[in-house]
Every structure is written in structure tokens, then in C-alpha cells.
Amino acid sequence: LDPVHGMWFALFCERRGLRFPSLRFVICSYEFVSVVHRRILARVFGVPVFNLYGSTETGHLLMENEAGEMKTSHETALLEMLDTDADGVGTLLTTTLSNDFMPLLRYRIGDLAQRNEQPYGTDYIVHGRIRDALTATDGRRVTTWQVDQCFTDVAGVAHYQLRPNADGQFRLRYIPDSGGPDERNLKPAVMGLEALLKTEVATESVPTLLPEASGKFRLTSP
């Protein structure tokens, strides 16, 4: 399920009182799974929401487990990290194992990720597209995942996009959910974003945000 289009469907079902009693879980894929979309899907359908990460050319690469950890699919690919920064975030490379007709060797999938090596295994955090990363005023790279974490405890947002203004500051445009967040509820997200970006962030409530030509939505856009 595409998380953004799935969120719109969930809100439609909520307004119409539609229920799916046989539904056991929701698997999201195709684009970045935001905490705001996940919150709405879980609220409306009342089931766990899992993230399946991959691409058309590689197949599935990572699957979220019940603990919220993104685990590697060892049967389909090997994953490597390249050019990691001080936060451990770097370019994700994949070598496919399941496509005999078009194998990919150390393929740059175009995403940023972070590898966490644990005593019981390795998991990953997918940080979003490389081209969608922002730059803070102090020159640091700020990823889509880092931006999205600012909305973890902020209810009332259905969808958003953060992008820089011509003056170097940033503007957060968001679509309200169920009346939308008031200024007090939105303040923690704004404070978190300003701490990340080291500059002021203006906010604007909008009725809609358009997708790219591909049909995907950009939560962050440089």
C-alpha cells in the first residue's frame, strides 16, 4: 500500500464509517513511510502497519518486524554502506542475489540509510532519497527521516512538505487531519525542525500538496 494514497483512503473510510474486520495488518511500500501516515493508517484500520522497502529493479530488500526494526532479506540481496557521515548515515548499495538475468553489483539505489549492528543481528533505518536531503545553515545534511522524526508526537497532520525559501529559511506546508493541529500542538515539531536546520521554520496550512510526475510525494524538497 502506498502510504500517502493509503492515508487518503483511510480518511475516506473513517468519514464513511467503513470497516474491514478481516484485516490483520497493513504493509506499506513504494515511497517513504512517514510517522504521520502510519499514525492515521493504524488509527483507522486498528491493525499494525509494517514497512516493506525495496525497488522495482532490486525487489524487496528490508522488512519491518513487530519490534519496528528493518531487517535484511538475505535471500534477495547484500547491502553495503558508502560515504557515511558523522551520524552513520550514508549511501545504500545493493548486490542482488535473486535475478539471474539482470544481476546488480553494488548498485546505488539512490537512498540514504543507517546500519545498526546489534548483538542479535543488524537492522537498518531508511533515511529517504539522496535528492530529497536538505542542508542546514551550518552545512550539515538533514535527511527525510530526521525531519519526519520531529512529527512523532504531533497529532493532527495528515501530510506535509518541508522546503527552503529563497531567503534561506524553511517553510513547512501541511494538510490538517481532523481539524488539524493548533499552534500549541504543532510547536514541538517546529522547534525540532528549527533545531535540525539551525534556522527559522514558517508554517502554512494548505488544502492539498501535489505529487511528482511519478505519482510519489516528496516530504522534503531542497
What are these regions, as identified by a protein language model?
Residues L1-P222:
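Active-site glycine/GP-rich loop and adjacent strand/helix microenvironment
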